[in-house]
Amino acid sequence: MKIGRDELVFETGFMAKQANGSVLATYGGSSVLATVCCSSNVREDLDFVPLSVEYNEKYYAAGKIPGGFIKREGKPKDKEILVSRLIDRPMRPLFDKRFGREIQVIPTTLATDQLNPPDIVGMNAAFTAVFLSDIPFNGPIAAVRMVYLNGKFIVNPSFEEIHDSDLDIVVAGSLNGITMVEGGANEVGEDILLSAIDGAHEYIKQICNAQKEFLDIVGKKEKLPLAFEEKIFEFKDELRDFVYADLKEACFVKGKLNRDKAITLLRNKSYEYFSSLEKLTDSNESLFHKAFDDFEKEIVRSSILNDNIRTDGRTPNEIRDIISEVDILSRTHGSALFTRGETQALAVTTLGTSIDEQIMDDIDGDKRLNFMLHYNFPPFSVGETGRLMTGRREIGHGHLAQRALESMVPGKNDFPYTIRVVSEVLESNGSSSMATVCAGSMSLMSAGVPVKGQVAGIAMGLISEGDKYVVLSDILGEEDHLGDMDFKVAGTKNGITGFQMDIKIENVTKDLMRDALEQARIGRIHILSIMNTVISNSRVGISKYAPKIVQLQIDIDKISLVIGSTGKTVKAITDEFEVKVQIEQNGKIILFGDDDFKMQKAKERIESIVREPKVGEIYEGTVKKINSFGAFIELTPAKEGFLSTRLKPRDSKYGSGRFGNSNRYSRFGGGGENIRGNAGLVRPPKLEEGQRIKVKIIDIDKFGKIDLEIVRDKDY
């Protein structure tokens, strides 16, 4: 089928035939093979879907060999993890928990044309492979990418179109509606985002219908059996009578930890009571806990839908109290602490040089990133113990926050620093990624990064039943877990910069999404107003602890002069002035260092190297060679002048003589003397090779030969 500029082709039955399902998807010149397998072991106690998605890209797909010492693909790159999450999130809710087997989906990029991104191809290959397999799956689903460029929407754009666009989103969904949206933007309005999602759904329906036709022809009609039937705790009514009234109070205790403690006490009390009645066994213990969870979910959702009261006492559109502070760490380049209710993020900005850029070696081509955001979620943030490690969740949340901020960060030409923002989540009760956006934005301003505007983020939720729904602003962790939709919106006062949405139900209407986006916009403006009372514009100047930068522009044909033979000249500048020198192909030179005076001297040295000499200019040169007629003085690595050492009258055609009068020589380090018996002649001072002397250009002939004279200190 034709989707955008190219045909999307699905093939099956000739590759990976031993898998439960396999599909080779091709779009343009990009091909991805997706397989799905399930284990033979069945577990009846699972209350989740044991799904793993391992998207991977092979270097041979782009005709490349991996860089570095190890010439084999290694652990998953961040990009592969992010694409795996894009595949996992819309697909996971469509598996039946009662299947009871581990499921593994492996999309492998086999070819890429460097024009069409393989991630969308991989998503559709994975969705189709699962749909055609014998694993129970409530499909079909499909995905497309939409961008907004020059006032038009483009489906499945090229890399170049993505780079130039104002909106870039990936949308997944079914025939009935949208299930996932993720992307970034350059301050676009809510209407543009909604139109992009609407347009994407039309293409998604085309792909879903093609999958259904494919299933009718080659798919496995007979599905594997479910491992168990859903069971209900046989004493559920008795449990309701025993605990429901107390649970209604416990669900609304103030404070996350206090609320969790109250609910846990009731759970334990109920467990002990039913155990004493010998109504709990190993076979129904999990059913007891599920029934208890169902009561909690019922109480919370009913309160929101019918009474507009949330577990912490807020109304649906109310945002938790916000406290912000900047510059709390004295030696860092920029820092900010953002606290919203029981969620707290500390963001620290560090400025570096081009040497600190992140080098990306992947099949889409080598890239250098000068803006990075890293998100850390330590176990103490939720009052637990655990390992300090970076998991898929941390990478995904960090990527979302980075996309929300990166359109506001200046380009390298305007701000030639490498920027790294690290977010440490110190407390978490919902929306830690959006707290990271807020803290990160203020931290950038604190560091003096000239961002285009302040960015705030907010997490929204949805509770629905039939045609009735309530949109929640600034959701808690439990509202995320018990709700029907989780979507995060980040942006400035002018528009959206980052967006992520996961929908757990079908038939989410356009009107509902419009209401949710408008409520998110109002919440975002409220948060921005509070942040702006702390810091509203970037600091003028950067931290004294950050590396200093001096820039200059030279002619391209003079780059070799600055570098010198085998890098000798640039190395000498680096060593003498303790600076780092970055030379770009367009003739732009950037100096990095810690000492302003030395940086300025280094700049002057480079300017003297590339400057065309003029009569009257003064240089501090080096004596390179001496002969019987005079000395050759190196003015720059590419320019030499000649200093005559022949006897000269005091008054020459140059006025005071090429070497000046005897008084001038007597003032030049004791050099210059009258010739005995001939007061009209003077002898120049003695020179040695390697000696540094101050000279003045007095003549340049038509062949470029430079004549010099010595200059006294007071003339320099």
UniProtKB/Swiss-Prot annotation:
In the UniProt record, which is one GO cellular component term? Answer: cytosol
Name where it's found.
Cytoplasm
Gene Ontology MF annotations? 3'-5'-RNA exonuclease activity; magnesium ion binding; polyribonucleotide nucleotidyltransferase activity; RNA binding
Enzyme Commission number: 2.7.7.8
Q: Which domain of life is it from?
A: Bacteria
Sections of the chain in a coiled coil: none
Q: Which reaction does it catalyse?
A: RNA(n+1) + phosphate = RNA(n) + a ribonucleoside 5'-diphosphate
| Gene Ontology biological process | mRNA catabolic process; RNA processing
Residue positions annotated to bind Mg(2+) are D480, D486
Question: Does the entry feature the keyword DNA damage, yes or no?
Answer: no
KH domain residues are 547-606
Q: Which cofactor does it need?
A: Mg(2+)
InterPro entries reported for this sequence: ExoRNase_PH_dom1, ExoRNase_PH_dom2, ExoRNase_PH_dom2_sf, KH_dom, KH_dom_type_1, KH_dom_type_1_sf, NA-bd_OB-fold, PNPase
What are the protein's UniProt keywords?
Answer: Cytoplasm, Magnesium, Metal-binding, Nucleotidyltransferase, RNA-binding, Transferase
Q: Where is the S1 motif domain?
A: 616-711
Q: Which family does it belong to?
A: Belongs to the polyribonucleotide nucleotidyltransferase family.
- What exactly does this protein do? Involved in mRNA degradation. Catalyzes the phosphorolysis of single-stranded polyribonucleotides processively in the 3'- to 5'-direction.
Q: What is this protein called?
A: Polyribonucleotide nucleotidyltransferase
Gene for this protein?
Answer: pnp
